[in-house]
Amino acid sequence: MAAMTVHLDIVSAENSIFKGRVACLQVTGVEGELGILPGHAPLLTTIKPGMARIIKQDGSEEVIYLSGGFLEVQPNSIAVLADVVMRADEIDEQAALEAKRRAEAHMADAGADFDYDAAMVELAKAMAQLRVVETIKKNIAR
């Protein structure tokens, strides 16, 4: 018996990074973690910077970094429209570590004109990229 699947498109302004049938999609929405399975109720929500975990039709898993964007769930399809999307092998771990360090230092040296929200967004993006890299490293080590 074939597993139930739904069509998934993950796109950014620059490219379409994933298109195909999936058994499950996990992303971080503004209200928390979301697990989208075939037959999910229609939904439109904002997604936070983080990891998209895709369980493909054949049971294999793929992890993608999303910098934030929108998730739309329809009866037969899922669409993720993200500002920036990257496969794990496209992430520069050292650059992400440096961005995290800069954001933390900026927050520690906050002045009167400090934009806390912007610093938190930059920190969240860097940490999300590092989580994707760490997840891939763990999967390779298995």
From Swiss-Prot:
Question: Where does it mainly reside?
Answer: membrane
Molecular function as annotated in GO: ATP binding; proton-transporting ATP synthase activity, rotational mechanism
- InterPro entries found in the cross-reference section: ATP_F1_dsu/esu_C_sf (IPR036794), ATP_synth_F1_dsu/esu (IPR001469), ATP_synth_F1_dsu/esu_N (IPR020546), ATP_synth_F1_esu_C (IPR020547), ATPsynth_dsu/esu_N (IPR036771)
Can the keyword ATP-binding be found in this entry's annotation?
no
What membrane topology does the UniProt entry give? Peripheral membrane protein
The alphabetized UniProt keywords are: ATP synthesis, Cell inner membrane, Cell membrane, CF(1), Hydrogen ion transport, Ion transport, Membrane, Transport
According to the UniProt record, one GO cellular component term is: plasma membrane
Where's it found, cell-wise? Cell inner membrane
- Keyword check for Transport, yes or no: yes
- One family name in Pfam for this protein: ATP-synt_DE_N
Stretch forming the signal peptide:
none
Q: By its UniProt entry, which SUPFAM superfamilies does this protein fall under? A: Epsilon subunit of F1F0-ATP synthase C-terminal domain, Epsilon subunit of F1F0-ATP synthase N-terminal domain
Protein family per UniProt: Belongs to the ATPase epsilon chain family.
- What does the record give as the function of this protein? Produces ATP from ADP in the presence of a proton gradient across the membrane.
Q: What NCBIfam families does the annotation carry?
A: ATP_synt_epsi (TIGR01216), PRK00571.1-4 (NF001847)
Q: Which PANTHER family match?
A: ATP SYNTHASE DELTA/EPSILON CHAIN, ATP SYNTHASE EPSILON CHAIN, CHLOROPLASTIC
**Subunit composition and interactions:** F-type ATPases have 2 components, CF(1) - the catalytic core - and CF(0) - the membrane proton channel. CF(1) has five subunits: alpha(3), beta(3), gamma(1), delta(1), epsilon(1). CF(0) has three main subunits: a, b and c.
Q: What is this protein called?
A: ATP synthase epsilon chain
Which source organism does the UniProt entry give? Shewanella sp. (strain W3-18-1)
